[in-house]
UniProtKB/Swiss-Prot annotation:
NCBIfam families: nadE. Residues 5-275 form the CN hydrolase domain. The active site is at residues 45, 114, 175, 357. This is Glutamine-dependent NAD(+) synthetase. The gene is NADSYN1. Residues 325-706 are annotated as: Ligase.
């Protein structure tokens, strides 16, 4: 009997409800796996329908079309003589489950339902699915007639079981189950399962990749075994970017690593591994073997098939590798860029329009589009015909081939500097120079006539003319005049997005890009329905601190020297009158806090789940060397006052790339009221009482320094 097995896992760029495209990508991955000698192919979670179907899971159509795709897979000659493990929703006894359907040569071997559902952060699986709660139990599932006709089976095993082939034993866990305190792979490994598979639908978060890798390597380090992880990749229809990172590990080491960010729709990993390495590794772990001797057995589905060959002694085996991680700046450069590409090609639009202000945020967004163009050109040079076909569709030129990123950027990105009498010459110059370096089609215009027309209507109706504070107006007048400028920019952005290509004799429209960062959204430091209102926002989940580091990275990686003056300039909205031609307004002065402080507040509020009093107590220790308790209290109260006053703005926030775990995104991730008692009387009184106690107890030690 052979001892070496070749197994395959993959990362697929599936699209919610794109059953035709999803089927073709699944078939392509199986074909690649077979051509590389694999006898087992694992695919991502819910790959048949696409993970992000959300409330479409309620529809019987989604179940029907998933089984139709399964029938097409069973019928295809590509799926013969290889165990195929695919993901789809299945209804059993009127209960909907998130399942793996494992089949071999037109026979369904096992339908394995997910036992631990993801229901935190962006995940809402309990809304659509029920976890299978009967450990080590199977039932007979009555197959649809379209499947019966192909498999000649009336039923198939449904439940928590493992596959026993001639030469090994294979068990399955699904995404979230790896993250639970008592993952199924533990008990399966103790029961002699040698190959564990994990089909995931895991999305990108900055600095998260190491957690996923650590979980897999630790699982196989403690218990031995081979571990395959598959994942979806790309944007499948909303704010999330699924970041691939398919992998194959054994006995605590990684043997194959998939890309985290890629424009390839299908990526297949294979490895040839020796089962005897698993057995000898386990044999010397006495604590593991004692536990295994008492382990409860899993139901075994016998499979008349082997993953190994009889004559495999000379077959080379895969060698362990070191996992290569991206820096946070590289993650920002690549993740949102790939997300933008998927959104652009699947929206059937002709490119992007970006209001380019000459500041860090819009410059970072421009850099992401340029990074996207770099990735596209790289894929085209490597021979990716699908990417080239998408490029030609977008620019509406059947023979076009991008020569370099600047060339492509000129075809798909229009940047627009919208000046007013409050704009400085410096920001105009910075925007123009950056546009020249990245190659975008750049427009400069002046919004003053539109502002004058709108405020003129108000004056005509009311007989009142509002003034800026610098000219003697009240704070209410000052804010209203700032907001008029910001909102007119949004109207003009959409006008130019719809008609700028038409004016140049080019078909199609443009997607409007927003540039509000996660910190500004958290505080509400933006005008509702201004240029933060757009079609999509690639930086809306990224902190100001990370964006500044990313812009510095772009200076070096892409030689965009125009960014140097942008990153060194004061951060300002330029909505108030200039003082002697110079900026008189800065963001941090307007906010009453620094961006660094704002990031801290955001992480404590969302990630650490703190209200005002808990945050105050936490920051007393964190900032004890720089702030007195009174100063900490004032800062915390100011943050929560501003956050709650502006919480309503989150309900209309532009869909943004999800990158940070403290995002205030209202759609699914951060669910809170938008009408608050903004004075927080009870909470702030608790803070005030604590400050008074501290001041009475040790006034001399509360100076904020050592």
């Amino acid at each position: 009997m052979g001892r070496k097995v070749t197994v395959a896992t993959c990362a697929l760029n599936q699209w919610a409800l794109d059953f035709e495209g999803n089927l073709q990508r699944i078939l392509k991955s199986i074909e690649i796996a077979k051509n590389r000698g694999a006898r087992y192919r694992l695919g991502p979670e819910l790959e048949i329908c696409g993970y992000g179907c959300w409330d479409h899971y309620y529809e019987s159509d989604t179940l029907l079309h998933s089984f139709q795709v399964l029938a097409a897979l069973l019928e295809s000659p590509v799926t013969q003589d290889i165990i195929c493990d695919v993901g789809m929703p299945v209804m059993h006894r009127n209960v909907r489950y998130n399942c793996r359907v494992i089949f071999l040569s037109r026979k369904i071997l096992l339908i394995r339902p997910k036992m631990a559902l993801a229901n935190e952060g962006n995940y809402r699986e309990l809304r659509w699915f029920t976890p299978w709660s009967r450990s080590r139990h199977t039932e007979e599932y009555l197959l649809p007639r379209m499947i019966q006709d192909l498999t000649k089976q009336e039923t198939a095993p449904f439940g928590d079981a493992v596959l026993a082939t001639w030469d090994t034993c294979i068990g399955s866990e699904i995404c979230e189950e790896l993250w639970t305190p008592h993952s199924p792979h533990i008990d399966m490994g103790l029961d002699g399962v040698e190959i564990i598979t994990n089909a995931s639908g895991s999305h990108h978060v900055l600095r998260k990749a190491n957690t996923r890798v650590d979980l897999v390597t630790m699982a196989t380090s403690k218990n031995g075994g081979i571990y395959l992880l598959a994942n979806q990749k790309g944007c499948d229809g909303d704010r999330l970017y699924y970041d691939g990172c398919a992998m194959i590990a054994m006995n605590g080491s990684v043997f194959a690593q998939g890309s985290q960010f890629s424009l390839d729709d299908v990526e297949v990993l294979t490895a040839t591994l020796d089962l005897e390495d698993v057995r000898s590794y386990r044999a010397e772990i006495s604590s593991r073997n004692l536990a295994a001797s008492r382990a409860s057995p899993y139901p075994r589905v016998k499979v008349d098939f082997a993953l190994s060959c009889h004559e495999d002694l000379l077959a080379p085996v895969s060698e362990p590798i070191e996992w290569k991680y991206h820096s946070p700046e590289e993650e920002i450069s690549l993740g949102p860029a790939c997300w933008l590409w998927d959104f652009l090609r699947r929206s059937q639009q002709g490119g992007f329009l970006l209001p380019l202000s000459g500041g860090v945020d819009s410059a970072a967004t421009a850099c992401l589009v340029y990074s996207m163009c770099c990735q596209v050109c790289k894929s085209v040079r490597s021979g990716n015909q699908e990417v080239l076909a998408d490029v030609r569709t977008i620019v509406n030129q059947i023979s076009y081939t991008p020569q370099d990123p600047r060339d492509l950027c000129g075809h798909i990105l229009t940047t627009c500097y919208m000046a007013s009498k409050n704009s400085s010459q410096e920001t105009c110059t910075r925007a123009r120079e950056l546009a020249q370096q990245i190659g975008s089609h750049h427009i400069s215009l002046n919004i003053d006539p539109a502002v004058k027309a709108v405020t003129g209507i108000f004056s005509l109706v009311t007989g009142k003319s509002p003034l800026f504070a610098a000219h003697g107006g009240s704070s209410r007048e000052n804010l209203a005049l700032q907001n008029v400028q910001a909102r007119i920019r949004m109207v003009l952005a959409y006008l130019f997005a719809q008609l700028s290509l038409w004016s140049r004799g080019i078909r199609g429209g443009l997607l409007v890009l927003g540039s509000a960062n996660v910190d500004e959204s958290l505080l509400g430091y933006l005008t509702k329905y201004d240029c933060s209102s757009a079609d999509i926002n690639p930086i809306g989940g990224i902190s100001k601190t990370d964006l500044r580091a990313f812009v510095q990275f772009c200076i070096e990686r892409f030689q965009l020297t125009a960014l140097q003056s942008i990153i060194s300039a004061p951060v300002t909205a330029e909505l108030e009158p200039l003082a002697d031609g110079q900026v008189s307004q800065t963001d941090e002065e307007d906010m009453g806090m620094t961006y660094a402080e704002l990031s801290v507040y955001g992480k404590l509020r969302k990630v650490a789940k703190m209200g005002p009093y808990s945050m105050f107590c936490k920051l007393l220790g964190m900032w004890r060397h720089v702030c007195t308790p009174r100063q900490v209290a004032d800062k915390v109260k100011w943050f929560f006052t501003k956050h709650s006053m502006n919480r309503h703005k989150m309900t209309t926030l532009t869909p943004a790339y999800h990158a940070e775990n403290y995002s205030p995104e209202d759609n699914r991730f951060d669910l809170r009221p938008f009408l608050y008692n903004t004075s927080w009387p009870w909470q702030f009184r608790c803070i005030e009482n604590q400050v008074l106690q501290l001041e009475r107890a040790a006034p001399q030690s509360l100076d904020g320094v050592d």
